[in-house]
Amino acid sequence: MTKTERYLQLRSMIPEMRRIKRIHFVGIGGAGMGGIAEVLVNEGYVVSGSDIAQNAVTDRLCLLGAKIHIGHGADNVQQADVVVVSTAINPENPEIIAAKELRIPIVRRAEMLAELMRYRHGVAIAGTHGKTTTTSLIASLYGQAGRDPTFVIGGLLNSAGTNARLGTSRYLIAEADESDASFLHLQPMVSVVTNIEADHMDTYGGDFEKLKSTFVDFLHNLPFYGVAVVCIDDAVVREIMPRIGRHMITYGFSDDADVQALNFHQQGHQCRFTVRRKGKEDLDLLLNLPGQHNVLNALAAIAVATEDEIDDSAIIQALAEFQGIGRRFQHLGKFATPKGEVMLVDDYGHHPSEVAATIKAARAGWPDKRLVMAYQPHRYTRTRDLYEDFIEVLSQVDCLLLLEVYSAGEAPIPGADGRALCRSIRLRGQLDPIFIASPDQLAEVLPDVLQEGDLLLTQGAGNIGALSRQLAASELGFSTAATTEVKP
């Protein structure tokens, strides 16, 4: 189907959108925004967007035909029929001001995603942790089964080489973002909740009960014939289950889970386990991802696929051949250092529970290796709100290099910066962390810290991901002579 044919088909499905031809994104370089933009480009819309810097997302969109502006300016929105904004964009942005003056409709990212989902069979994945991996696994299972879904993911699906794709079927599989409560715009047929923890609490006025109620509201956006797939291992999810008035399928390691994992064993990068489902034969599975937390993510995907009558053979093959997601326990290689060869793994996790899961997976897969973590805290508010939890989890590694907080646009908060966190961990007495005031200093410190056989884990949601790739490209002073790709 050509772009023109697809455009006309969408017009027949959504006649009310017939006058919308040009869509402009403010902050188009983010994974979530860029993913929706990519789908819209491929549906035949004229897409433009702006961001403060060029990146891989903007480069890909340029190749697809989108017009990208580096920097924000009022002129960028002049021809737009609608403007899409991310929550990271300041209301005083010149493009927002210009759109208001021109009376151009301004919608949030989730509202546009909701329109994409309106006439499709939507599968929306929400939760504090595991959204990207779970969404990627579900998309992979549906793809393996020949369902050819449209998907929008918050990270790079390695097998597809992108985080978004326009499929030919009625399925749309997407992450649902609770950070600003915008996931309440979505009206899917299937909703997944992986877990619920205190995060993005500024959105909820610091009220955890409000956060829990918002997840209940999200599940009640399902039609009465929809399905809620929820992780019964999570204490908060279990707590809210009596309040959910929709058909539920539970998953987890718990004995009372509808989709249960048994006989878990991890070896290196891979996990083996048995899945037990009501009314179905047990399946012995190989998952090409490490850690019990990823088995939970796989169980969610299995539950969704089983409910949609996807064949077991597709489930088995998709999990065994899963190629992972960018920055989710991603092996970047083995590298020679002055004191010997080390293994480099990069991970996006930036909440204490995510960091703990990553550490647990590393310990289980490589128990004999010394674990060296370079951690970059993300947001001052998160560091402040979860300060004691960060002290606890970061004390579990063998060697810690702690970078300054990546602000993500926030103003510094006294006592919630990297230096204060480093001092608090040192006072605990288990570890003597090294504070890295500037990301550029990481290259200077690592050669003295790393030892033969270490597992170096770069962790965080800020620009530490770019630093890890510089390491992998041997741009931080490491020798390239012994560089080899790590195979799972």
UniProtKB/Swiss-Prot annotation:
One of its GO terms (biological process) is cell division. GO terms for cellular component: cytoplasm. Pathway: Cell wall biogenesis; peptidoglycan biosynthesis. It is an enzyme of class 6 (ligase). One of its GO terms (molecular function) is UDP-N-acetylmuramate-L-alanine ligase activity. It is found in: Cytoplasm. It catalyses: UDP-N-acetyl-alpha-D-muramate + L-alanine + ATP = UDP-N-acetyl-alpha-D-muramoyl-L-alanine + ADP + phosphate + H(+). ATP binds at G127, T128, H129, G130, K131, T132, T133. Pfam families: Mur_ligase, Mur_ligase_C, Mur_ligase_M. Keywords: ATP-binding, Cell cycle, Cell division, Cell shape, Cell wall biogenesis/degradation, Cytoplasm, Ligase, Nucleotide-binding, Peptidoglycan synthesis. It comes from the Bacteria. Its EC number is 6.3.2.8. Belongs to the MurCDEF family. Cell wall formation. This is UDP-N-acetylmuramate--L-alanine ligase. It comes from Shewanella sp. (strain MR-7). The gene is murC.
